């Protein structure tokens, strides 16, 4: 993804739940209380770009000076996006899942989450899901480009609406490449 990739920017704006580990003066406006502090253990939903920074940067705690590594400002809480029920649904049948309704930027967010927490299980689930859904995306892209005179079937249209933005890019690229291959074969 590039520096100005709109999908990456939109994914970074997705709100994730977090819990503050410190009392922070002057940030009450994040809770809707301007001029007041955010209290310790306050739970908020903040954009991913902000939560990521606050989860990495730590502050020195006055409570326990023996701790060598500073506690980060916030602790990221697992979002509903990666809840066990969602992961189980992916494992049981990734092609039947409406990924767009879960999040339009599911793959981007999952990649960032797995990288941030070194989550090997999530990475494996994503890999398996991409392989399974990728085959289905390829089948739909090829069938549309091969039979461009025919109308799309209802199943194909429904499946295409369940794709997230990354999968839509894969679909478009596959479709264009199939059309180019078809042209090349005709010329040969």
Curated annotation (Swiss-Prot):
It is found in: Nucleus. One of its GO terms (cellular component) is GINS complex. Pfam families: PSF3_N (PF22466), Sld5 (PF05916). InterPro entries: GINS_A, GINS_bundle-like_dom_sf, GINS_Psf3, GINS_Psf3_sf, PSF3_N. CDD domains: GINS_A_psf3 (cd11713), GINS_B_Psf3 (cd21693). Keywords: DNA replication, Nucleus. The keyword Nucleus applies. GO terms for biological process: mitotic DNA replication initiation. The keyword Hydrolase does not apply. PANTHER family: DNA REPLICATION COMPLEX GINS PROTEIN PSF3. Component of the GINS complex which is a heterotetramer of SLD5, PSF1, PSF2 and PSF3. Belongs to the GINS3/PSF3 family. The GINS complex plays an essential role in the initiation of DNA replication. This is DNA replication complex GINS protein PSF3. It comes from Kluyveromyces lactis (strain ATCC 8585 / CBS 2359 / DSM 70799 / NBRC 1267 / NRRL Y-1140 / WM37).
